[in-house]
């Protein structure tokens, strides 16, 4: 289990192995798809903690990877508060933000029996975001 971040703990014990492993996984990825849970209008404690630790090892946690950010909720807000925070922090965290998509009223848009999004505007927005992410990955490969 990842310890809760604190500067005192960092001085005493250094950086946990999980933070290094997290950064290694990101380094090996062509792109990132990050799904945010909204807790009281902000990041979840688990997300905040891993990013706090990882940013002490590499300030640009997302390592300039093409990034698609997603958030959803059962209500009409679609976790828009946390998504706005994520978008605002993207440049300083080293994310090449391709798209950020909020999915409001999740249960209205997702068919849990089939495990798929229902057809409609929300599904179209998600599909377009994936196409844009794929294009960014291909462009990065071509430039390398």
Predicted regions: what is each one?
Residues 1-56, 114-144:
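N-terminal beta1-alpha1-beta2 submodule of the flavodoxin-like/Rossmannoid cofactor-binding fold
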Residues 1, 5, 58, 93-99, ...:
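Glycine-rich, flexible loop/turn motifs
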Residues 63-107, 120-124:
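Short, glycine-/small-residue-rich phosphate/pyrophosphate-handling segment
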Residues 61, 100, 140-144:
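Short, polar/charged, Gly/Pro-enriched helix-capping and turn/loop motifs at alpha-helix termini
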Residues 62-64, 112-117:
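Glycine-rich NAD(P)-binding loop of Rossmann-like domains
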Residues 7-10, 104-108:
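Short beta->alpha junction loops
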């Amino acid at each position: 289990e990842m310890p809760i971040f604190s500067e005192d703990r960092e001085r005493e014990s250094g950086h946990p192995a999980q933070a290094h492993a997290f950064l290694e996984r990101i380094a090996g990825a062509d792109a990132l798809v990050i799904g945010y849970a909204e807790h009281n209008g902000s990041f979840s404690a688990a997300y905040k903690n891993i990013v706090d630790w990882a940013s002490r090892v590499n300030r640009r946690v997302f390592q300039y990877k093409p990034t698609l950010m997603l958030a959803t909720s059962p209500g009409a807000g679609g976790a828009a508060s946390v998504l706005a925070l994520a978008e605002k922090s993207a440049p300083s965290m080293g994310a090449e933000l391709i798209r950020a998509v909020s999915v409001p009223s999740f249960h209205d848009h997702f068919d849990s029996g089939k495990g798929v999004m229902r057809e409609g505007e929300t599904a179209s927005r998600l599909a377009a975001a994936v196409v844009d992410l794929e294009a960014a990955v291909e462009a990065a490969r071509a430039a390398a």
